[in-house]
Swiss-Prot record:
Protein name per the record: Phosphatidate cytidylyltransferase
Entry's transmembrane regions: 9-29, 46-66, 70-90, 102-122, 130-150, 172-192, 196-216
Catalytic activity: a 1,2-diacyl-sn-glycero-3-phosphate + CTP + H(+) = a CDP-1,2-diacyl-sn-glycerol + diphosphate
Gene this chain is encoded by: cdsA
Pathway stated in the Swiss-Prot or TrEMBL entry: Phospholipid metabolism; CDP-diacylglycerol biosynthesis; CDP-diacylglycerol from sn-glycerol 3-phosphate: step 3/3
UniProt keyword annotation of Secreted present: no
Location in or out of the cell: Cell membrane
Length: 260
């Protein structure tokens, strides 16, 4: 418990100033977190990060995370670059004489999309304003807190025992219920540019998909037989263990709220 608490304090002391500052430093921080998260995923599948497919995946990740407002050249690089990376990774299945399988290639490409899109929207959301990233973080935090409390007090029906045996249906809906507090309170202080009823609906959707993101990462770990995605955060696991919900919440937040 002491290690877990100390890790959380140190992480917050590093993370919060960068989040508040935003801009280039946050974007570079997002790239760093994404590369670590990609390494964690590849390690689960016994693919070394410092290997040909690992390094190609890392390059593809950087390409997919390039800022969208940098100009048309970014979209050109992303399209042509990702097509080229896909062909190279697929070709390596032959060059490696099937030691690197087609399933491994598909896993690399899926990992790049999963991690890259999630962390790209991390800094893109912050660039739209601190209120939006705060909105996302509070939804995820209150959902997790509510799911834990309701699950402990009332949880009797397992949500998905094969993937995450501790999660319950009562906790799932308890998390959604607690997340509703976020827009109700935030609208008193900041303008989120949406009717409160629509905002409540968006919050419910984000809470549901945040929990789904948690289950997806749990599914990865269960499939590959690992307890945590990594060990970079003592007592907390890896980067993916901390950001799994945001992989789903942040892209959806941009689609449903920011880009509307």
């Amino acid at each position: 418990m002491k290690v877990r608490t100390l890790t959380a304090i140190i992480a917050l002391l590093i993370f919060l100033p960068i989040l508040l500052k935003g801009g280039l430093i946050l974007m570079l921080f997002a790239f760093l977190l994404a590369l670590i998260a990609l390494k964690e995923l590849l390690n689960m599948n016994m693919i070394k990060f410092l290997s040909i497919p690992g390094l190609i995946s890392a390059l593809a990740l950087i390409i997919i995370m390039l800022p969208q407002d940098a100009g048309e050249w970014v979209q050109v690089i992303q399209l042509k670059g990702l097509i080229a990376m896909s062909f190279i990774v697929l070709s390596y299945t032959v060059l490696s004489k099937n030691r690197f399988s087609f399933m491994d290639a598909a896993f690399c490409l899926m990992s790049v999309a999963y991690v890259g899109i999630g962390f790209m929207y991390f800094y893109e959301t912050r660039s739209e304003g601190l209120r939006y990233i705060l909105f996302a973080f509070l939804i995820v935090w209150l959902t997790d807190t509510g799911a834990y409390i309701f699950g402990r007090l009332m949880g009797k029906h397992k949500l998905w025992p094969v993937i995450s045996p501790n999660k319950t249906i009562e906790g799932f809906f308890g998390g959604i219920l607690c997340s509703i507090l976020v827009p109700l309170v935030m609208q008193m202080f900041v303008d989120l540019h949406m009717n409160i009823w629509l905002l409540l609906l968006v919050t419910i959707v984000l809470s549901m998909f945040g929990q789904l993101g948690d289950l997806v990462e749990s599914g990865f770990k269960r499939h590959f037989g690992v307890k945590d995605s990594g060990r970079i955060l003592p007592g907390h696991g890896g980067i993916l263990d901390r950001f799994d919900s945001f992989m789903f919440v942040l892209p959806l937040l941009n689609i449903l709220l920011i880009q509307t």
